[in-house]
């Protein structure tokens, strides 16, 4: 198992970390604890020593489940990470209440990596004003937290504001070979990665396979990769691309099935950084996927709020997923079962306020009508 050394912390973790957000589930939605525990045990036996959970994962059941599993392991054999859901913390007292409950749910006295969950600039500033950030540094001094950091869903400007404000032990970003542009509202991209390198802040990567979408590529997009290695999975290319960046200390993958775990273990044992030809092939795959985009929305949200309640960027995100990856069944489920009807493109009255402020000068009204027709037809 490939390992990475954390110089400041003086520890060594597996490069692959187990994300406990997408564990296998039963038909009623509860965690399939027999299968999930077997997966975690298999990962640990193969050398994975970092396990990541969070207060809200699996409807609040991930932390207690992980706690029951790790109770059977020697404490020194793994590193545990969890996160504070700041959107549920309107006061320092509420944050402290949740924090204390996490130790009980996990059954531990110390948490190795503690994160402020899903930060953007405004959420960070609020947490700081409430005293939550200073209090957690005190918790680290007391030894209840060993490493203090955050996960971030903001662009590079927002990330830089947060990074430069504290002596963080680490940070966690979404990064993959498609999410390299920092213009989108929630993506720091290449610029965000470069910031962590410049500041010497160890980086943990989430969504290296972009929620699984980079594991199922259309044939034309996969062609540059399969030409070099027909046997390699699409997921392995995405993971190797991320792991080839020198400041990446750990890559999280939310493995929900045995075959996913087996494939990832083979990617990381042994791990092979991309060579020049392989890096060029991944870049060509990314170019092909970007060429299939339906509309060049960057997710900047200058068009929001829509007076009719249409979530314009999220409509475009689903439409672009269909264009880039196909996957009509997955897109249909997202559109019909998970996307609120009140926010769909059908509510557009063509007022044009969105187009007046769009920095990309996109034909938003025409595109909304087209996407509604295409997605409804799935």
Where are the regions that the model predicts?
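Active-site groove signature of glycoside hydrolases
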Residues: 103-124
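Conserved, mostly hydrophobic/aromatic
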Residues: 6, 18, 43, 51, ...
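Active-site mouth loops of central-metabolism enzymes
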Residues: 22-34, 83-93, 122-125, 222-229
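Beta/alpha (TIM)-barrel catalytic core signal, keyed to glycine-rich beta->alpha loops juxtaposed to Asp/Glu
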Residues: 119-298, 302-310, 314-317, 326-340, ...
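Local cysteine-cluster metal-coordination motifs and their immediate loop/turn environment
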Residues: 294-309, 345-361
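Short Fe-S-cluster ligation motifs
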Residues: 325-353, 377-378
């Amino acid at each position: 198992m490939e390992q990475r050394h954390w110089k400041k912390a003086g520890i060594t973790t597996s490069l692959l970390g187990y994300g406990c957000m997408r564990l296998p589930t039963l038909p009623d939605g509860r965690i399939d604890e027999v299968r999930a525990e077997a997966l975690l045990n298999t990962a640990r036996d193969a050398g994975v020593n970092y396990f990541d959970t969070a207060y809200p994962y699996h409807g609040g059941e991930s932390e207690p489940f992980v706690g029951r599993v790790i109770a059977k392991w020697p404490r020194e054999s793994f590193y545990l990470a969890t996160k504070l859901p700041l959107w549920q913390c309107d006061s320092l007292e509420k944050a402290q209440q949740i924090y204390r409950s996490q130790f009980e749910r996990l059954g531990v006295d110390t948490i190795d990596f503690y994160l402020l969950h899903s930060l953007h600039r405004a959420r960070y500033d609020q947490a700081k004003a409430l005293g939550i950030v200073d209090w957690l540094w005190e918790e680290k001094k007391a030894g209840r937290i060993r490493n203090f950091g955050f996960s971030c869903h903001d662009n590079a400007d927002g990330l830089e504001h947060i990074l430069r404000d504290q002596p963080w032990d680490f940070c966690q970003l979404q990064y993959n070979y498609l999410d390299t542009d920092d213009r989108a509202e929630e993506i720091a991209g290449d610029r965000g990665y470069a910031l962590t390198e410049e500041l010497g802040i160890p980086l943990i990567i989430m969504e290296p396979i972009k929620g699984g979408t980079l594991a199922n590529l259309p044939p034309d997009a996969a062609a540059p990769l399969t030409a070099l290695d027909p046997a390699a999975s699409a997921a392995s290319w995405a993971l190797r691309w991320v792991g080839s960046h020198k400041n990446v200390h750990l890559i999280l993958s939310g493995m929900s099935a045995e075959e996913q775990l087996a494939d990832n273990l083979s990617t990381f044992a042994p791990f092979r950084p991309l060579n020049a030809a392989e890096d060029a092939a991944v870049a060509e795959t990314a170019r092909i996927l970007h060429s299939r985009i339906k509309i060049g929305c960057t997710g900047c949200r200058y068009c929001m709020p829509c007076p009719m309640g249409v979530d314009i960027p999220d409509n475009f995100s689903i439409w672009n997923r269909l264009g880039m990856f196909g996957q009509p069944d997955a897109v249909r489920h997202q559109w019909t079962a998970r996307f609120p009807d009140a926010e769909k493109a059908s509510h557009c009255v063509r007022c044009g306020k969105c187009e007046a402020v769009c920095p990309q000068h996109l034909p938003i009204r025409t595109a909304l009508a087209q996407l509604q027709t295409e997605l409804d037809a799935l």
